[in-house]
Amino acid sequence: GAEARTFADKPLVTDFNDYEIRIEEVFRFNPEDTLVFHVTLRNKSDQEIRYLPESFCVRAGSRLYFQSISDAPGVLPPQSASTVYFAITGTPDGGRNELALKNEFSVLVTRLSPPPTPAVVTNRVVVPVKPLHTPRNQP
């Protein structure tokens, strides 16, 4: 059997300015030492955001745990949300992670598209410049 924790009452959200990752539910399968995360990625910008669907990881305390599998599209259209599932199994060195559901998790993913560049505003006045001499054969 699996244990479950839902976050409807107090969502765990990792905010990255133009997008955020919200944990909806986490399931723990103890015999397999696997946690399955159900998360929502929300693009808050007007630009498409691309990410590596195989790059999900979770921070619990000071440690990072990398996904064993994911079901994710890899692209977030502007002003949209996407449901993603991914699993964490064991530790990178092959041991058991024994991660409890009560941890305060942060979800991370590797982004492919660069963040939007801020618009540059200047107060400089543009003055047209006349040529110093007239080109030949011109009045």
Indicate where each model-derived feature is located.
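Short aromatic-acidic-glycine turn motif
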Residues: 46-49, 57-70
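A eukaryote-biased signal for short, well-structured alpha-helical docking elements
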Residues: 1-14
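Short, solvent-exposed beta-strand/turn "edge" segments of beta-rich domains on protein surfaces
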Residues: 22-33, 75
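Short, hydrophobic/aromatic beta-strand segments
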Residues: 36, 47-55, 95-102
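Structural beta-strand segments of beta-rich domains
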Residues: 35-37, 82
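Short, solvent-exposed, Trp/other aromatic-anchored flexible loops in extracytoplasmic proteins
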Residues: 63-121, 126-139
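Asparagine-centered strand-capping/turn motif at beta-strand->loop junctions
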Residues: 41-45
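N-terminal edge beta-strand
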Residues: 16-21
